[in-house]
């Protein structure tokens, strides 16, 4: 299935607090200790700002998709249509609707396990 990107995505630039060169397509959040900076989500209770689209080193510009359709890294198997949350490594996992942790988007493709890249709608 092809997905058309019509320019409706919301993409921002922040500063990578740490080396995020190995974190492309993982979920990032605001670094509360540093203005205009991001870190990889590190807990299932974190509220993601968006998906890291590039591979910045520490102090470099981090391109973050806050809303739209994008690739994301999985932390476990994910079914097409599943609601998505974050795991303790910044990757997406299936999030049950009744769960108190934040729902971040919906899977548009399927993952067989951790470490795969899928397409998701992020909101």
At which residue positions do the language-model features occur?
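Surface-exposed, low-hydrophobicity beta-strand/loop segments enriched in small/polar/acidic residues
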Residues: 1-123
């Amino acid at each position: 299935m092809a997905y058309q990107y019509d320019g409706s995505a919301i993409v921002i630039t922040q500063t990578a607090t740490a080396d995020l060169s190995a974190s492309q397509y993982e979920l990032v959040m605001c670094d509360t200790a540093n203005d205009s900076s991001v870190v990889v989500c590190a807990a299932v209770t974190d509220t993601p700002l968006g998906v890291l689209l590039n591979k910045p080193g520490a102090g470099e510009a981090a391109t973050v998709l806050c809303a739209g359709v994008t690739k994301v890294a999985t932390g476990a198997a994910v079914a097409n249509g599943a609601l998505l949350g974050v795991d303790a490594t910044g990757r997406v996992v299936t999030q049950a609707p009744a769960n108190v942790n934040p729902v971040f988007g919906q899977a548009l493709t399927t993952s067989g396990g951790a470490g795969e890249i899928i397409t998701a709608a992020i909101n």
